[in-house]
């Protein structure tokens, strides 16, 4: 078996794709990037099947079947070919050999991360490594393989018949988000921060230093119920939505304020001025500490970079460019026929290739005690095999034309369009998957609701499985559904 996607750069990729497209009748009516999707998947029968299911194993199987049906033909073929091409496979795997130091903070602790929640440094270390990997190997070939830095969508337009369902999903996502933000593990518990405080901080970091003389709450050093200065909690909250760069802006504003006070020293009480500058810098430092320990940052940093994690798992399993086609074929077959966790683990252990057992050994421990939403994004689970699937299993690289048979992997849904001209097939499909889940399970009792996670990915602006959203600013659950 050999990798037939012999591509090392964008020009070669374009030539390969044009040839492939001619012979395979790809379309982009319902998808952002060309795919085999000729119609929006109909999942109604799975709702009916779920209604009569009697046990969890049966329900899991029905949902797995619905997922495959929903995603079988909608993967972005150009980008999937790029991710599996000979050039990216070679560079993607070699990078890990050369960058042991870059991944050390979490790679060395992999065994512990299989059973326990990561430290915030291990999450941010992962995200920095993912961005470095993308840059170093030249992963970006177009916007669909980019690292995003936009703001979350302010508006999300959906067909009238699913507005209420999307709002129901958002409501549950907000409930979960609040549970996370208010969990007991924060080192710095703090109550809700008012819009007024955040708005003041936003103006202050823009350089309006005179505002420090008279904040709306009175004294610049006033504390809230938590005993923490309101300036600090306001800045920390602002950083959660606008990024940590606001701390540097805040320091610049304080420098400008100090310059103003120096310039007018004859009209200034020096002791009061020095005290104000010292305290403002102290409040900024406290805000940085709050931000670093915040659950919002933890949630943001726990997002999986699908391509980076998938390559990391290949590397850990000892896959080489020569054995890569066997992994690709295995994942392609996995996406054709839905399998439960047990069957999938059995399939991994049954393959004669060494990587099968090694991938199995990478799986998170069943004794992982916490909510699985906190799990490190580099830890492999049965569910996350689908991340590898969308990368390497959409097109079996030894026989690329077989991709026309379809292979379903969850994140392919992000390739479905969200525009109103096509009636937002992405949201419609996600809502139908939610309906399937809701019919069989008590949504409130679930750690992770897969369909809600997909909606969240769509709201942060992802239009492809291969985009990194770590630097996307804002809160996705604030989107206005219209």
UniProtKB/Swiss-Prot annotation:
Main subcellular location: virion
Subcellular location: Virion
Pfam families: Nairo_nucleo
Effect recorded for residue 266 to A: Complete loss of cleavage by host CASP3/caspase 3
InterPro entries: Nairo_nucleocap
Cofactors named for this entry: Mn(2+)
Annotated site residue numbers, Homooligomerization: 213, 267-268, 276, 352
Keywords linked to the UniProt accession: Capsid protein, Helical capsid protein, Hydrolase, Ribonucleoprotein, RNA-binding, Viral nucleoprotein, Virion
One GO cellular component term: viral nucleocapsid
Site (described: Cleavage by host CASP3/caspase 3): 269-270
A Gene Ontology molecular function term of the record: hydrolase activity
Record annotation: effect of changing residue 374 to A: Slight loss of DNA endonuclease activity
Top EC group: hydrolase
Chain span(s) of sequence motif DEVD: 266-269
Family from the record: Belongs to the nairovirus nucleocapsid protein family.
Domain notes: The DEVD motif is a CASP3/caspase 3 cleavage site essential for viral replication in host cell. However, the importance for viral replication is apprently not linked to caspase cleavage. This motif is involved in homooligomerization.
UniProt subunit comment: Probable homooligomer; forms a double superhelical polymer. Monomer.
Function: Binds dsRNA and ssRNA and probably participates in the packaging of viral genome. In the dsRNA binding mode, the nucleocapsid protein specifically binds to the vRNA panhandle secondary structure formed at the termini of viral genome. Does not discriminate between viral and nonviral RNAs through ssRNA binding mode. Displays dsDNA endonuclease activity that is sequence non-specific.
Protein name: Nucleoprotein
Gene transcribed to yield this protein: N
């Amino acid at each position: 078996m050999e990798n037939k996607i012999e591509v090392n750069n964008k020009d070669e990729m374009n030539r390969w794709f044009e040839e492939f497209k001619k012979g395979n009748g790809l379309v982009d009516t319902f998808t952002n990037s060309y795919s085999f999707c000729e119609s929006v998947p109909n999942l109604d029968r799975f709702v009916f099947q779920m209604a009569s299911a009697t046990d969890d194993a049966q329900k899991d199987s029905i949902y797995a079947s619905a997922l495959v049906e929903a995603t079988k033909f909608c993967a972005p073929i150009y980008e999937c070919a790029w991710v599996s091409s000979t050039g990216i496979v070679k560079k993607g795997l070699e990078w890990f050999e050369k960058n042991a130091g870059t991944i050390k903070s979490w790679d060395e602790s992999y065994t512990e991360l299989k059973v326990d929640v990561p430290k915030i440094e291990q999450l941010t270390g992962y995200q920095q490594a993912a961005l470095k990997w993308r840059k170093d190997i030249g992963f970006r070939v177009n916007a669909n393989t980019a690292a995003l830095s936009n703001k979350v969508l302010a508006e999300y337009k959906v067909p009238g018949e699913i507005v209420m369902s999307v709002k129901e999903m958002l409501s549950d996502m907000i409930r979960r988000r609040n549970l996370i933000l208010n969990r007991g593990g924060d080192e710095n518990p703090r109550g809700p921060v008012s819009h007024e405080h955040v708005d003041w901080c936003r103006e202050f970091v823009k350089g309006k230093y005179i505002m420090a003389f008279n904040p709306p709450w009175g004294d610049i050093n006033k504390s809230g119920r938590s005993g923490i200065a309101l300036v600090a909690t306001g800045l920390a909250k602002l950083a959660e939505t606008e990024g940590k760069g606001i701390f540097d802006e805040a320091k610049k504003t304080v420098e400008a304020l100090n310059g103003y006070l120096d310039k007018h020293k004859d009209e200034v009480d020096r002791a009061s001025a020095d005290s104000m500058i010292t305290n403002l810098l102290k409040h900024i430092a406290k805000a940085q500490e709050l931000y670093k320990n915040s659950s919002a940052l933890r949630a943001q940093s726990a997002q999986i970079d699908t391509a980076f994690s998938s390559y990391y798992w290949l590397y850990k399993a000892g896959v080489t460019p020569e054995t890569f086609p066997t992994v690709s074929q295995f994942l392609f077959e996995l996406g054709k026929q839905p399998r439960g966790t047990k069957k999938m683990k059995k399939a991994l252990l049954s393959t004669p290739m060494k990587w099968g057992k090694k991938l199995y050994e990478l799986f998170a421990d069943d004794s992982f005690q916490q909510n699985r939403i906190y799990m490190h994004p580099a830890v492999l689970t049965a569910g996350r095999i689908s991340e590898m699937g969308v990368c390497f299993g959409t097109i079996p690289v030894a026989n690329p034309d077989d991709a026309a048979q379809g292979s379903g992997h969850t994140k392919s849904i992000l390739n479905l369009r969200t525009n109103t001209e096509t009636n937002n097939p992405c949201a419609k499909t996600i809502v139908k998957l939610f309906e399937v889940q809701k019919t069989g399970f008590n949504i409130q009792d679930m750690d992770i609701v897969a369909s809600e996670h997909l909606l969240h990915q769509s709201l942060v602006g992802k239009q492809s499985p291969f985009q990194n959203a770590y630097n996307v600013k804002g809160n996705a659950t604030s989107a206005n559904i219209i």
